[in-house]
UniProtKB/Swiss-Prot annotation:
Gene source species: Pseudoalteromonas translucida (strain TAC 125)
Presence of keyword S-adenosyl-L-methionine: no
Disulfide bonds: none
InterPro entries: aa-tRNA-synth_II/BPL/LPL, B3/B4_tRNA-bd, DNA-bd_dom_put_sf, Fdx_antiC-bd, Fdx_antiC-bd_sf, NA-bd_OB-fold, Phe-tRNA-ligase_IIc_bsu, Phe-tRNA-ligase_IIc_bsu_bact
Higher taxonomy: Bacteria, Pseudomonadati, Pseudomonadota, Gammaproteobacteria, Alteromonadales
Protein name: Phenylalanine--tRNA ligase beta subunit
GO biological process: phenylalanyl-tRNA aminoacylation
Enzyme class at the top of the EC tree: ligase
């Protein structure tokens, strides 16, 4: 936002120069982007009056004038401007004056006529880049006065780059309040008396969409004269704020916007049929805007309409049909509060960005509408005349923002800032910022003013106190913290252990989104009910993941499409399960998962090339389980899991609870997800593997070990893991190693049976085992297998 420094100093005038003021604003969070002069450098230009104006005898486009600049003699000046005429006040560059560009005025003759000076245009004085003809000054401009002094051109234009949360400073009133607080001085409050209605004309107002517009004020002004020019003082303030003068009505609404920070709009009263309705746009409704462009309105767009048509896009842009023209004599003045949520993003959807939308998106003071309409009314009556009707207000009080009370604790303030600020200073800062403050028990209770949409929590108040107090005023103190050594639980396994294990086995860690494509997730987990986001980034990221598989498989497919022959990815993260008993109805479960496909090993002359299979992923899973030093508590069963191949999948159980799965991706799922080659996956809940059995110190036996091999026949459906578990239980302390070294099916074996060759290693720590001891253990093992699995020794 650009503004005139002199205009600001009319409201509050601290005893500091421009540079100090700019630095002060920047340090308070209102960053100054630049400071430029209000006009180019020139001197010797006075206010003059055209007392004679005649045609040049030898040139059709030139006029010979006599100008009164307050001296003893009139100045003869030849002028070519078409608007030069008798009686107007003008800017006169006298002989010796120096204009921008080091242009010096000298005595001259133009087509034989003497010219002792020059009548200046705005462009020639570097005041404006636009304008036709010479400057026309107000009729009450004092002749002979230095133009720089008269127009207050020894001024600076300050450009501040405000953050989106500081919409309250998008007006001179808000900026003055900030400067007053920063310098601990009072602000000259603008007194805005109510304008007495002199006519009874009014327009009915209906709030159809109360949530988007809870307050709307309208006032009829009749009999305005738009042939009147906008006063130069207002034109100059608008210019220095980067706003071009258009006509008196538009200029007044723009002036109020810049002064109070409140957007306004004026309608041609004769274009309004019936009354005003503030509603959402109808399907297919169109509107021709003031710039002549026609737009098709979205149904989510709030519009100002009469009983038959849309008149304007609320808070953004007016319509051409109801716009004020030079033929307008009666207007309806609008002053409204629009909910920032209703305006945010609407302007961009139509390719627009206006001063009004810029402010309404950030939040306009919802208590300012009456002051704004009274201020605009008074200015209009002063400039263009007319008669004002009563202010008509439609309000949904329950839909207006509520006053928020925020508590600031002394302990919290000191801890965050790291410095003690006196109670009186804190109270003064908050009070000057407009907060209604109550001091109680080492804390402050502050009612947030209606113009501060950005203050909602305690940290917001701390920020306000700190920035006004001045960050440079807070002493530099090195942070101190007590370091308390935390005890390390040896039974807890660090996540890095699992990561390092997988990396050592050729995996690379991936990080995928928690938001996944619900269609892809349904392919892998058709029975799971996903948590659908109400406002997703995109349709492809609209569901919370119920496992890591959708994200990992999407990454695998991405890498396959880039010709990667060997892919091994793993991820640690959360899966999100719907659970009514959990906090917010969501159970967040930490898991670790992985996917593999392609070659089992990189190409090498020693090993033959082969693709990964079920036992590769099983080995990786067992490597993770082995970190717990308690493999016996895990039970692996051949069971089908969602999205996995029915003949190549397994489920991991701990104490009867499912804690993980692994296996081959189902061919149908593989095809649906555009994945080539056989792919294997695994996922384990971290709660099942994050604790380990601490290793117990035991002496190394000095007695010999004995190996006995047994070959048994069992039905093909018998789980080998169950057999090994049973042997471990019956083997006792003397069984120190157990190994399945052969599985055979085929010739010599009955159909539906398999042969298992198992090596038992027996050893004692206190004696040499005798043959009878060894046979006793082996016989117990064989008997147990026969009893539990109907196993028999193979001949």
């Amino acid at each position: 936002m650009k503004f005139s420094e002199k205009w600001l100093r009319e409201w509050v005038n601290p005893a500091i120069d421009t540079q100090a003021l700019s630095e002060q604003l920047s340090m308070a969070g209102l960053e100054v982007d630049g400071v430029t002069p209000a006009a180019a450098k020139f001197n010797g230009v006075l206010v003059g009056e055209v007392v004679e104006c005649g045609q040049h005898p030898d040139a059709d486009k030139l006029r010979v004038t006599k100008i009164n600049v307050g001296g003893d003699e009139l100045l003869d000046i030849v002028c070519g401007a078409p608007n030069c005429r008798l009686g107007i006040k003008v800017a006169v560059a006298t002989v010796g004056a120096v204009l921008p560009g080091d242009f010096k005025i000298k005595k001259a003759k133009l087509r034989g006529q003497p010219s002792n000076g020059m009548l200046c245009a705005f462009v020639e004085l570097g005041i404006s880049e636009e304008g036709d003809g010479i400057m026309e000054l107000p009729s009450d401009a004092p002749v002979g006065t230095d133009l720089r002094e008269y127009l207050g051109l020894d001024d600076n234009i300050i450009d501040v780059d405000l953050t989106p949360n500081r919409g309250d400073c998008l007006g001179i009133k808000g900026l003055a309040r900030e400067v007053g607080v920063l310098n601990s001085i009072d602000v000259n409050v603008l007194q805005i008396p109510a304008v007495t209605a002199t006519v009874d004309d009014k327009v009915s107002i209906e709030l159809v969409n109360e949530d988007a517009c809870p307050r709307y004020l309208g006032r009829v002004i009749k009999g305005i004269n738009l042939d009147t020019a906008t006063p130069l003082w207002m034109v100059e303030k608008l210019r220095r704020s980067g706003v071009r003068s258009i006509d008196p009505v538009v200029d007044v609404t723009n002036y109020v916007l810049l002064e109070l920070g409140h957007p306004m709009h004026a309608f041609d009263l004769n274009a309004i049929e019936g009354g005003i309705k503030v509603r959402s746009a109808n399907a297919g409704e169109e509107l021709v805007l003031l710039d002549g462009n026609s737009v098709k309105l979205n149904e989510s767009t709030l519009v100002i309409a009469d009983h038959n048509k849309a008149l304007a896009i609320a808070g953004i842009f007016g319509g051409e049909q109801s716009g004020v023209t030079n033929k307008t004599s009666d207007i309806l003045l609008e002053s409204a509060f629009f909910n920032p949520v209703a305006i945010a993003g609407q302007a961009r959807s139509y390719g627009l960005h206006t001063d009004a939308s810029h402010r309404y998106e950030r939040g306009v003071d919802f208590a300012l509408q009456h002051d704004a309409i009274e201020r605009a009314t008074a200015l209009l009556l002063e400039i263009v005349g007319g008669e004002a009707g009563p202010v008509v207000e439609a309000v949904a009080a329950d839909k207006l923002p509520k006053v928020t009370e925020v508590r600031l604790r002394r302990s919290r303030l000191d801890r965050v800032i790291g410095h003690h600020i006196e109670d009186e200073k804190v109270t003064d800062i908050l009070t000057r910022l407009g907060f209604n403050v109550k001091v109680e028990n080492d804390s402050w209770s502050a009612d947030v003013p209606s113009y501060r949409f950005d203050v909602r929590i305690e940290e917001d108040l701390i920020e306000e106190v700190a920035r006004v107090y001045g960050y440079n005023s807070i002493p530099n103190v090195a942070p101190t913290a007590k370091l308390k050594m935390t005890t390390h639980n040896e039974a807890t396994i660090a996540l890095s252990k699992f990561r390092n294990t997988l990396v050592a086995r050729g995996y690379q860690e991936a990080i995928t989104y928690s938001f996944v494509d619900p269609k892809a997730q349904a392919i892998l987990h058709p029975e799971s009910q996903p948590l659908v986001l109400p406002h997703p980034i995109s349709i492809e990221m609209s569901a919370m993941r119920v496992s890591l598989m959708p994200g990992l498989l999407a990454s695998l497919a991405y890498n396959q499409n880039r010709q990667q022959p060997r892919i091994r990815l793993f991820e640690h993260g959360l899966k999100f399960l719907s659970d009514e008993n959990a906090e917010n109805g969501v159970n967040q479960v930490p898991v670790i998962g992985g996917v593999i496909t392609g070659l089992a090993h990189g190409e090498h002359w020693v090993e033959e090339k082969r693709n990964v299979d079920f036992y590769d992923v099983k080995g990786d899973v067992e490597a993770l389980l082995a970190i717990t030093n308690d493999m016996s508590r895990f039970e692996i069963k051949a069971e089908q899991s969602d999205g996995l191949h029915p003949g190549q999948s397994a489920v991991i159980y701990v104490a009867g609870k499912k804690v993980g799965f692994f296996g081959a991706l189902h061919p149908q799922a593989q095809k649906s997800l555009d994945i080539n080659n056989a792919t294997f996956v695994f996922e384990i809940e971290m709660s099942a593997i994050e604790k380990r059995n601490l290793p117990q110190v035991a002496g190394v036996s000095k007695f010999p070990s004995n190996r006995r091999d047994i070959a048994i026949l069992v039905q093909e459906s018998v789980n080998i893991g169950d057999i090994l578990t049973a042997i471990e239980k019956v083997g006792g302390n003397q069984l120190v190693d157990l190994n399945l070294f052969d599985v055979y099916k085929g010739k010599g074996i009955e159909p539906n049976y398999k042969s298992l060759a198992i090596a038992l290693t027996l050893q004692s720590v206190d004696r040499t085992l005798e043959e009878k001891d060894i046979n006793l253990v082996v016989d117990n093992v064989v008997a147990t297998l026969a009893e539990q699995f109907n196993a028999s020794l193979r001949d």
